[in-house]
Amino acid sequence: MPGDEETLDLPAWNRVPDLTWGPHHRSAMASLDSEVREECLREDLKFYFMSPCEKYRARRQIPWKLGLQILKIVMVTTQLVRFGLSNQLVVAFKEDNTVAFKHLFLKGFSGVDEDDYSCSIYTQENTYESIFFAIKQYRHLKNISLATLGYGESEDNRTGLKVCKQHYKTGAMFSSNETLNIDSDIETDCIHLDLQVLTTEPEDWAQTSFFRLDFYRLVQVDISFALKGIDLQAVHSREIPDCYLFQNTITFDNTAHSGKIKIYLNSEANIEECKNMNISGSTQRSTHYLLVFDVFVIMICLASLILCTRSIVLALRLRKRFLNFFLEKYKQRVCGADQWEFVNGWYVLVTISDLMTIIGSILKMEIKAKKLTNYDVCSILLGTSTLFVWVGVIRYLGYFQTYNVLILTMQASLPKVLRFCACAGMIYLGYTFCGWIVLGPYHEKFENLNIVAECLFSLVNGDDMFATFAQIQQKSILVWLFSRLYLYSFISLFIYMVLSLFIALITDSYHTIKKYQQHGFPETDLQKFLKESGSKDGYQKQPSALLSCLCCLRRRRSNDHLILID
């Protein structure tokens, strides 16, 4: 093909001047050259679509990527398990401390949160008692706490408590004629109580005017303080323990002015580098081993990334050769399905997995070195990459007809399933918005859109049906009747019709694949080209030795363009 192939590097005895060749000879050699290029392209295509075992038998090419993927699965999974155990300790330590803080600083906390808040109070006396209780508990923290806690510095580099109250700017209430004048602008007043102030006797700080609350104007009271802690359970795992700074905020929420003040405790834990720590044993050596292991994982993923990227590039080159040849010979373009055969989705998946593993491993090393503290991003990267690695193994099982039914069924049913889900999703969203608007005030499972979507999805799978029916409040007969019509229609529509059709689409694709496996798949243009004979009847009289020589010479010159993909 012009511009795409190099000229033949023939031996000196074969380089005859064009003037000695007649028109018949030049036409024959041109046809022979086209025949050689077609045979070379067909061989490269056949080799590209071979399995690693077939490639090894054909050209003795060792399947490096297959061996590397198997090794990578073992290494990445081991890395993920170790990181998951470490992350589990971190999350458990944070949650345990949050529960401990609620018991320490919230008066009357029962151990179980009320909805999304911890506890609630209903009288002015209980409000003052709860505020002063939290302050006094902070003062006597080291004498009452079981944990290794200490006082930390807040964001303004001060040790102690910061109490802020938000209230409407001005207001006046006259109970005689039931009038209330309120300026909707909210102002915030704050006071800082140092440890020296809290330890004074008598407690003069409690008698200040700041703690005289006008409850009809009060919007919110916040008590903020910082505490330090050490996670010593990491020592049992032969790791360097983490030091934490807990930024705690106790919020008394009176926004609704309904006679009920909700109390929240929010604790944000930040990991910091421990200072002046001396731990004997093999902890430091164990950390070094983990860092070396992470470096080895990065090297394996980098090698896999290079090999897969090279394979993708070579596949695109082969695709370009085939498209140009097909257009030149048959005067038509290759269909899109055949073009996508050259884009190996498994290589793309492995490439993405390698990139995520490399980035996640680097973050993990920084976390082990106490330079970073964000476990969540690292866990998402490592977890997703491990998922992709294990999914990529299916590619090698797909070479066996017994195991590739799942892959072929997913490929065949995915377009139809996506189109079906797009239509069913419109109905699902309609039910979601309707349930949120109508049933939200009367049912805890319909309070917001996220919970409604989760509740409806559970109903589609047949989970928790009776509880959803039973928990509706019968304060309004009209809403109660509507809830029955709403739930019965949704369950009937999605379980008996939508879900059944969804399964039928996948089942139909499965039966189609089984039928094709028994009677053969429909042949595409690419498959027909691979089955064609490379030589035509008009050129069978040409010496086969010359054809073989030309093919070998051409392959020797165009060796860089061969597709050697295992």
Swiss-Prot record:
GO terms for biological process: adaptive immune response; innate immune response; macrophage migration; neutrophil migration; positive regulation of chemokine (C-C motif) ligand 5 production; positive regulation of chemokine (C-X-C motif) ligand 2 production; positive regulation of chemokine production; positive regulation of macrophage inflammatory protein 1 alpha production. The chain crosses the membrane at residues 66-86, 289-309, 347-367, 377-397, 420-440, 481-502. Disruption phenotype: No visible phenotype. The secretion of specific cytokines (CCL3, CCL5 and CXCL2) by macrophages exposed to bacterial lipopolysaccharide (LPS) is decreased. Mutant mice display decreased migration of macrophages into the intraperitoneal space after injection with LPS, or after infection with E.coli O78:H11 (strain H10407). The most N-terminal extracellular/lumenal domain (referred to as I-II linker or polycystin-mucolipin domain) contributes to a structure with a four-fold rotational symmetry in a tetrameric assembly; the structure contains a central highly electronegative pore with a 14 A diameter. The pore is critical for Ca(2+) and pH regulation. The protruding structure formed by the I-II linkers may contain all the interaction sites with lipids and proteins in the endolysosomal lumen. Expressed in activated macrophages and microglia (at protein level). Residues 107-123 are annotated as: Extracellular/lumenal pore loop. A motif (Selectivity filter) lies at residues 461-464. GO terms for cellular component: lysosomal membrane; plasma membrane; recycling endosome; recycling endosome membrane. Keywords: Adaptive immunity, Calcium, Calcium channel, Calcium transport, Cell membrane, Disulfide bond, Endosome, Immunity, Innate immunity, Ion channel, Ion transport, Lysosome, Membrane, Protein transport, Transmembrane, Transmembrane helix, Transport. Residues 1-65, 310-346, 398-419, 503-566 are cytoplasmic. This is Mucolipin-2. GO terms for molecular function: calcium channel activity; identical protein binding; iron ion transmembrane transporter activity. Residues 87-288, 368-376, 441-448, 470-480 are extracellular. Disulfide bonds join 164-190, 243-274.
